Each structure stands twice: as structure tokens, then as C-alpha cells.
Amino acid sequence: MNSTSLYAAIDLGSNSFHMLVVREAAGSIQTLTRIKRKVRLAAGLNNDNHLSAEAMERGWQCLRLFAERLQDIPQPQIRVVATATLRLAVNAGEFIAKAQTILGCPVQVISGEEEARLIYQGVAHTTGGADQRLVVDIGGASTELVTGTGAQTTSLFSLSMGCVTWLERYFSDRNLAQENFDDAEKAARDVLRPVADELRFHGWKVCVGASGTVQALQEIMMAQGMDERITLAKLQQLKQRAIQCGRLEELEIEGLTLERALVFPSGLAILIAIFTELNIQSMTLAGGALREGLVYGMLHLAVDQDIRSRTLQNIQRRFIVDTDQANRVAKLADNFLKQVENAWHIEPISRELLLSACQLHEIGLSVDFKQAPYHAAYLVRHLDLPGYTPAQKKLLATLLLNQTNPVDLSSLHQQNAVPPRVAEQLCRLLRLAILFAGRRRDDLVPEITLRALNENLTLTLPGDWLAHHPLGKELIDQESQWQSYVHWPLDVR
């Protein structure tokens, strides 16, 4: 592999050290290596902000691992940044001097504002949804809050509170008592209060979380079959569960890994404070943050206004998809959706996911015609899809699995991006669009009227169409039968 196409970003965080190695190919990024080590550097800071020898040694040990991977990458294509703990540590110079010797490249201690800006860039390049956003990143010793529109930030704050420092300060007795949570939340709200007005002034349409705490919450919710949106009610529920566990070493929540458990209660307390102080309705997980911001900065790639479209185009190119046919199916599905939207009230994001499924429905053919829907579902489940959340990927895979043949109703109910009923409706529209676009020519798609009354669909074709299309009639009869097996009434006239 040509080493000039390789880039590395290293983030010396207060809780973990991370390394990301990517390959740049035709304007898109392919992840080659992700390494994360819990170093808990912030835990080595004493009251005088002196970093202990043990904490420094843990950090250097980790960097020796990273250094081996960096040898293959040109130095101008490596960025190493240090954040909150090394901003605070009075003896940071000692740590950084040795770190630079180990890595063989410069280590830059960045300001809180620069960290916030890079986090925002990482989110803007990798996360779909509305353009106007609030980004929250809870680190080990600092929390970044950024508002922005598109690629531009409108306000940037780096606050000195984090999941490691709050753990040491409010849960040092390892007690998960209500009082400890109350103290941690109150302290976090006090830190937030001076910046809350400016953040609210700039406003946001979506809120995105980019930290280990949010990642942990996402994993918990997926494991427990909840939808992926984080809400204050869910956070309070998890807090009560933690309090029931009593002690940090006994913390057990389905979906919470042992690795994340130690700093989970302190991160949770900070997040509850942020939700309460800023009146956040819901939050989803970002597709990337600081490291992605560093990589995209080195590549000088512009922020794509529509990340999901870029992702779909890259995948269509890679799997040699017939884009004319994909567009034909998408146009027909959209037409059907418009005809039933008054009855079914499908939200804009659900429409977008249906059209995404249309664009990708034939990728399974790149493996084999036999079992193409299975191949398509497998590929979508395992591909990196910037702009789509894990739950949205699961929905897309489920729709592609059920694009033809008998319907697997349980799979539509197991995804958690949309309610089961909506997943069923999207699946029905996708199947009909694929069926009627089957001859792969615009002029051979009949004029179809679709009406919905609750779950009953009535499909009306031009007068003599069925008589003149015996194969088409056979396919429609088969589809009606398959839909009837799962109690989806389809009346064809």
C-alpha cells in the first residue's frame, strides 16, 4: 500500500488514548486501524495539578504501542494532540518531551476552544441529520459544548469537568448513592450555568453526543431493545438502576461493558446536568469527533452538506449498482409514499431511510443473484455508513432483507430506529416499488394509484394492464399472497 495515502490522528485524552489510522481514497476515508487504551491520565493529577510518575508511565507505555504503527506513515500526515489533563498538569513538559521521543513526531497541547472546534468538524463530516446542531463531548477532564450550522461553529465552550475528575471528586468512596449523584449534578450545573444562555441563543435543531458516555448509553439502549434516542427520562431511569446497585464495583446494567463501567456514573451525572440546564429533548450518537476532525483537517476535505448522499454514492460506485434503476425504484417509492402519507403519517427521517434503502437495494447482486437480499442486508449491516446511526443501519439492513420473498416480520420488529408499524409500512412500499420497476424502463412503469385505510392498501392499475401483462399479474398475485401471510391486506384492482 502506498504510504502517502495513509493518515494518523492520535488523541491523548484524560481518560483514554486513541489512535486512528485511515487511508484516503478518491475523497473518502477508509478506516484501517483504531486503537484505544484506558490510561486514565486525569486520575494521576493531585491537588497541585502535578501528574504522578505512575500515570505518566501508563501513558508512555501506551505510546510505545502506537509508535510501532506510525513508522509506516509520513510525518506530515500524523497529528498528535493532547487535551485537558496535559493543559492542566504543571509538569506536562516532562511527559510531552518523552512522548515526542517515543512517537518520533511533535505532540501539540491544544486549547479547549481548539478541541471543541475539531470535535465539531469531526461531527460535521460524519454525522447526518439537520444542519443546525449542538455537539456535546464529555471527556475525562473537560466537556466541550459547541453549536454550529453546517461546517461553521457559532459558539465554542470547553468546561473543566469530566468523567474522571467527577469520579474522583464525587464518587471517590465508590458509593452510588443519591446524594453523590445530587452533588455531582449540582456541581456540573454550576459549571454550565455561565455558558447556557449563549448556547441557547444560538439554538439547535438536533443534539449530538460524541463521547464514551454517549457511546455507552447507545450500547445499553441497543442491548435493551430501546430506540436509540437518549432522553432525560432514560437517563433518570439508568441513574435509579445505578443507585439500586449501591456500589461502583457492583454496577451491572445490561449492555454496559466492564471497561466503561468505572466512569459511567460520573459521565451520567454530567449528562443529566447538561440535559436539565439546556432543556435538551433528545440526543443521538455522533459518527465521529476529535480524531475524525484531525484527519479531515489534514485532508482539507470540505464538509459535505449531505453526508448520507455522499455515502450512498460511494457505496453504489463500489458495488457497481445500476443507479438508473436505483433512482427509478426510489422515485416510485416516493410517489407511493406521497399517496398514503395522509393515512400513514410517515415522518421525514423515515422517508429518507426508505429512499436510502431504494438506492442500495441491489448491492447484494454484486455477490450473487442467489440470495441477493441476504447479501445486501449483510453488506449494509457491516459497511461503514457515515451519516447513518447504528439503529438506522439496522433498519436499512432489515428492509433490504425483506425486499422480496416471504416477509420476516420478527426482523422488522427487532430494529429500533422506527416503531415496528412504521418499519412494516416502509417495507410494503419498498417491495411494491421494486416489483413495479422490475422491467428497468421508465416508460414501462404503469400509472398506479395507491390508497391506505389503516393497514389496508388498495392498488389500482390502468384498466387492461393486468390482462396484457400475465407475468406482471403473476408477480402481483404472489406479492399479495406474501403480504397476506403477515396480515398486510393488499387489494389489487
UniProtKB/Swiss-Prot annotation:
<comment type="pathway">
    <text>Purine metabolism; ppGpp biosynthesis; ppGpp from GTP: step 2/2.</text>
</comment>
<protein>
    <recommendedName>
        <fullName>Guanosine-5'-triphosphate,3'-diphosphate pyrophosphatase</fullName>
        <ecNumber>3.6.1.40</ecNumber>
    </recommendedName>
</protein>
<dbReference type="GO" id="GO:0015949">
    <property type="term" value="P:nucleobase-containing small molecule interconversion"/>
</dbReference>
<dbReference type="GO" id="GO:0015970">
    <property type="term" value="P:guanosine tetraphosphate biosynthetic process"/>
</dbReference>
<dbReference type="Pfam" id="PF21447">
    <property type="entry name" value="Ppx-GppA_III"/>
</dbReference>
<dbReference type="InterPro" id="IPR048950">
    <property type="entry name" value="Ppx_GppA_C"/>
</dbReference>
<keyword id="KW-0378">Hydrolase</keyword>
<dbReference type="InterPro" id="IPR050273">
    <property type="entry name" value="GppA/Ppx_hydrolase"/>
</dbReference>
<dbReference type="InterPro" id="IPR023709">
    <property type="entry name" value="Guo-5TP_3DP_PyrP"/>
</dbReference>
<dbReference type="Pfam" id="PF02541">
    <property type="entry name" value="Ppx-GppA"/>
</dbReference>
<comment type="function">
    <text>Catalyzes the conversion of pppGpp to ppGpp. Guanosine pentaphosphate (pppGpp) is a cytoplasmic signaling molecule which together with ppGpp controls the 'stringent response', an adaptive process that allows bacteria to respond to amino acid starvation, resulting in the coordinated regulation of numerous cellular activities.</text>
</comment>
<dbReference type="InterPro" id="IPR030673">
    <property type="entry name" value="PyroPPase_GppA_Ppx"/>
</dbReference>
<dbReference type="InterPro" id="IPR043129">
    <property type="entry name" value="ATPase_NBD"/>
</dbReference>
<dbReference type="GO" id="GO:0015974">
    <property type="term" value="P:guanosine pentaphosphate catabolic process"/>
</dbReference>
<comment type="similarity">
    <text>Belongs to the GppA/Ppx family. GppA subfamily.</text>
</comment>
<dbReference type="InterPro" id="IPR003695">
    <property type="entry name" value="Ppx_GppA_N"/>
</dbReference>
<dbReference type="GO" id="GO:0008894">
    <property type="term" value="F:guanosine-5'-triphosphate,3'-diphosphate diphosphatase activity"/>
</dbReference>
